[in-house]
Curated annotation (Swiss-Prot):
Enzyme class: oxidoreductase
Molecular-function annotations in GO: 3-isopropylmalate dehydrogenase activity; magnesium ion binding; NAD binding
Gene designation: LEU2
Catalytic activity: (2R,3S)-3-isopropylmalate + NAD(+) = 4-methyl-2-oxopentanoate + CO2 + NADH
Cross-referenced InterPro entries: IsoCit/isopropylmalate_DH_CS, IsoPropMal-DH-like_dom, Isopropylmalate_DH
Cofactor(s) needed by this chain: Mg(2+); Mn(2+)
The protein's name: 3-isopropylmalate dehydrogenase
Species this protein is from: Maudiozyma humilis (Sour dough yeast)
Lineage top rank: taxon: Eukaryota
Gene Ontology terms: biological process: L-leucine biosynthetic process
Residues binding NAD(+): 79-90, 289-300
Length: 363
């Protein structure tokens, strides 16, 4: 039986076009090998490119197409050209997350490639075995709270607000992911409950939700500043699922991203529901930014291609194909086909071509 999956592609700015081209190349390789699978790619604008063309960072047609799609693939947004004015590329990203209800951001941090252990800033004996996923609440908290800009009085403020249902929702996401493993993965919850009222509600709600709804699971609470130290000193201690608020998740996942040695390796998924049936709606993007200073052909496409692997497994119910993509990436990197960030000499397209060819070998 033939199946067609609609994927909205939002290249965004600078390297975004290059990396999404390589990611769709890999999906096309899957379709070539599996004639019953078809992908309908719909390209739209977001970020600075959208501002230049339409005056807004997220055109209505891009948002509406995304709402109707099976999944969304995003490149990267932003750059110095658009500065910090009233209309900014990043506003498009915040809006699409909110409008699509993408409340959970998943950022894996692991060493799938032992051949890259020497790339980590940590000694191999500390980096080896690191395997956790940050589950970041994405559409609430201080980034979406009430704020006051400086109106000339020299005073500004931002506010963080969380409700019990919002914390329950992200806790259930982490629990769902933990239960997909046998034995279930441990859960860490990061907060600042010794200082912040919002964190005290967070900790209480996480604890009660796990206890009442998922009694077979365990959760351990850690203060965010302590967790940041653990991440450098002994990152494997956090193995499992790491659940935290929007701002804390933003910071801790960026810190975690340097452990594997390059941002060009790290994928992410933003989901609107738990992937219990591998059909959760989601937006997929690399963890790195738009890299406006990087020459053409130098960006590493692996993070975006691994984001596609997550898409296949979590949103498109194509787990076998997703695993094939992961195996293909591992083979290509182990064979030394790498971009400059991994001390290689290959171009963006050469890495993408090699992965697309390798995918066919594993299907």
């Amino acid at each position: 039986m033939s199946t067609t999956k609609t994927i909205v592609v939002l290249p965004g700015d600078h390297v975004g076009t290059e990396i999404t081209e390589e990611a769709t190349k890999v999906l096309n390789a899957i379709a070539e090998k599996r004639p019953n699978i078809k992908f309908d790619f719909q390209h739209h604008l977001i970020g600075g490119a959208a501002i230049d063309a339409t005056g807004v960072p997220l055109p209505d047609e891009a948002l509406e197409a995304s709402k109707k799609a099976d999944a969304v693939l995003l490149g990267a947004v932003g750059g110095p050209k658009w500065g910090t004015g009233d209309v900014r590329p990043e506003q498009g990203l915040l809006k699409i997350r909110k409008e699509l209800g993408l409340y959970a951001n998943l950022r894996p941090c692991n060493f799938a490639f032992d051949s890259l252990l020497d790339m980590s800033p940590l000694k191999p004996e500390y980096a080896r075995g690191t395997d956790f996923t940050v589950v970041r609440e994405l559409v609430c908290g201080i980034y979406f709270g009430k704020r006051k800009e400086d109106t000339g009085d020299g005073v500004t403020w931002d506010s963080e607000q969380y409700s019990v249902p919002e914390v329950q929702r992200i806790t259930r996401m982490a629990a769902s992911l933990a239960l997909q493993h046998n034995p279930p993965l441990p859960i860490w919850s990061l907060d600042k409950a010794n200082v912040l009222a919002s964190s005290r509600l967070w900790r209480k709600t996480v604890e009660e939700t796990i206890k009442n709804e998922f009694p077979t699971l365990s959760v351990q609470h850690q203060l965010i500043d302590s967790a940041a130290m653990i991440l450098v000193k002994n990152p494997t201690k956090l193995n499992g699922l790491v659940i935290t608020s929007n701002m804390f998740g933003d910071i801790i996942s960026d810190e975690a991203s340097v452990i594997p040695g390059s941002l060009g390796l790290l994928p992410s998924a933003s989901l609107a529901s738990p992937p219990d049936t591998n059909k959760a709606f989601g937006l997929y993007e690399p963890c790195h930014g738009s890299a406006p200073d990087l020459p053409k052909g130098k960006v590493n496409p692996v993070a975006t291609i691994l984001s596609v692997a997550m898409m296949l497994k979590l949103s498109l119910d194509m787990v076998e194909e997703g695993i094939a993509v992961e195996k293909a990436v591992r083979k290509v990197i182990d064979n030394g086909i790498r971009t400059a960030d991994l001390r290689g000499t290959n171009s963006t397209t050469e890495v993408g071509d090699a992965i697309a060819a390798a995918v066919k070998e594993f299907l």
